[in-house]
Amino acid sequence: MGLETEKADVQLFMDDDSYSHHSGLEYADPEKFADSGQDRDPHRLNSHLKLGFEDVIAEPVTTHSFDKVWICSHALFEISKYVMYKFLTVFLAIPLAFIAGILFATLSCLHIWILMPFVKTCLMVLPSVQTIWKSVTDVFIAPLCTSIGRSFSSVSLQLSQD
């Protein structure tokens, strides 16, 4: 607990004179914040979650709201997204991390101590099972299929047009 040291990656500049028909949102330079701490998503698992206001809300050229409405909506969207994410992570991150840790530990234990020994045992036993299965197939199934094949080979079919 202490002072918040993270920097925001979005800045809103609300100058009334510079707004025309665009949103006026100027994103901060990504290189500026690249070395501001550790990369929390080094494998880019959640790169699809980088949504901006324009990805969610879009007004076609023919139907524009007032510039002030657009600016306020944009600001409220960004602020509410930021605040709600922080609020939810305060209450959910630690319990969900604990549950995920228990789940992954359980699955790892089951995989290491139950599943892999079972698979290795099956792979050791399979050559002898394969030999027995081949013998059963040669003794019972092959003669049956051969006799059925010979029976059907003597059947002839002739079509005539009347």
Curated annotation (Swiss-Prot):
Sequence positions bearing Phosphoserine: 20, 23, 36
PTM annotation, UniProt: Phosphorylated on serine and tyrosine residues. CAV1 promotes phosphorylation on Ser-23 which then targets the complex to the plasma membrane, lipid rafts and caveolae. Phosphorylation on Ser-36 appears to modulate mitosis in endothelial cells. Phosphorylation on both Tyr-19 and Tyr-27 is required for insulin-induced 'Ser-727' phosphorylation of STAT3 and its activation. Phosphorylation on Tyr-19 is required for insulin-induced phosphorylation of MAPK1 and DNA binding of STAT3. Tyrosine phosphorylation is induced by both EGF and insulin (By. similarity).
Phosphotyrosine: residues carrying this PTM: 19, 27
GO terms for cellular component: caveola; cytoplasmic vesicle; focal adhesion; Golgi membrane; nucleus; perinuclear region of cytoplasm; plasma membrane raft; sarcolemma
Intramembrane segments: 87-107
Keyword Nucleus among UniProt keywords: yes
Keyword flag Transport: no
A GO molecular function held by the record: molecular adaptor activity
Membrane-spanning residues: none
Location relative to the cell: Nucleus; Cytoplasm; Golgi apparatus membrane; Cell membrane
GO-annotated biological processes: caveola assembly; endoplasmic reticulum organization; insulin receptor signaling pathway; mitochondrion organization; negative regulation of endothelial cell proliferation; positive regulation of dopamine receptor signaling pathway; regulation of cytosolic calcium ion concentration; skeletal muscle fiber development
Highest taxon listed in the record's lineage: Eukaryota
Oligomeric and partner information: Monomer or homodimer. Interacts with CAV1; the interaction forms a stable heterooligomeric complex that is required for targeting to lipid rafts and for caveolae formation. Tyrosine phosphorylated forms do not form heterooligomers with the Tyr-19-phosphorylated form existing as a monomer or dimer, and the Tyr-27-form as a monomer only. Interacts (tyrosine phosphorylated form) with the SH2 domain-containing proteins, RASA1, NCK1 and SRC. Interacts (tyrosine phosphorylated form) with INSR, the interaction (Tyr-27-phosphorylated form) is increased on insulin stimulation.
Functional description taken from the UniProt entry: May act as a scaffolding protein within caveolar membranes. Interacts directly with G-protein alpha subunits and can functionally regulate their activity. Acts as an accessory protein in conjunction with CAV1 in targeting to lipid rafts and driving caveolae formation. The Ser-36 phosphorylated form has a role in modulating mitosis in endothelial cells. Positive regulator of cellular mitogenesis of the MAPK signaling pathway. Required for the insulin-stimulated nuclear translocation and activation of MAPK1 and STAT3, and the subsequent regulation of cell cycle progression.
Entry protein name: Caveolin-2
Organism ancestry: Eukaryota, Metazoa, Chordata, Craniata, Vertebrata
The encoding gene: CAV2
